[in-house]
Amino acid sequence: MPSLYLASASPRRRELLTQIGVPLSVLVTAIDESPLPNEAPAAYVERLARGKAAAGLAMLEGRGEDGCVLGADTSVVIDGRILGKPVDQADGLAMLAALSGREHQVLTAVALAAAGGVEARVVECRVRFRQVAPEEALRYWQSGEPADKAGGYAIQGLGAIFVSRIEGSYSAVVGLPLCETAELLREFGIPCWQPVGGNPP
């Protein structure tokens, strides 16, 4: 069975893979995450997921090791505009104001790379926020949670109270669509429900 490497420092993605019984090692890769001119959001997240997986595989091959590398990327999209991680407080508050009382898209791409090639899936979800008062948004920003989150919120954290409805995969909004990820892993010969950390699933 191939070893799985996660090309991400995201603790959320690591926890999701552990949840479905997939042992892994973490590889930290760095790629240029700037959108290309006129790049569609779905194409953007898929390109980044593939790029992270390919960069991780190149790192493995450079060490003379084999394995499968998983890359993923999540973006929040509203009015066709990609909301990345906020650069500062003003940016974070502007994101929350844009999302307040409205529906937005969350796009998550997952890619698996091995010596035989790269396969990817893109999953779209729709999330609706209730109205978020400015003072709430400020308190939320001051919690520290939004600073490193795409779109400036975490559905699995304190930001859950803003979400009135979700259509699609909850785990994809968190950062990894588990149904599609499990299908990809199976294609690459990696089963779910393995013992992780010495405990049976």
Swiss-Prot record:
Keywords: Cytoplasm, Hydrolase, Nucleotide metabolism. It comes from the Bacteria. Its EC number is 3.6.1.9. Its cofactor is a divalent metal cation. The record marks R12, T74, Q156 as: Important for substrate specificity. Pfam families: Maf. Transmembrane segments: none annotated. Belongs to the Maf family. YhdE subfamily. This is dTTP/UTP pyrophosphatase. It comes from Pseudomonas aeruginosa (strain ATCC 15692 / DSM 22644 / CIP 104116 / JCM 14847 / LMG 12228 / 1C / PRS 101 / PAO1).
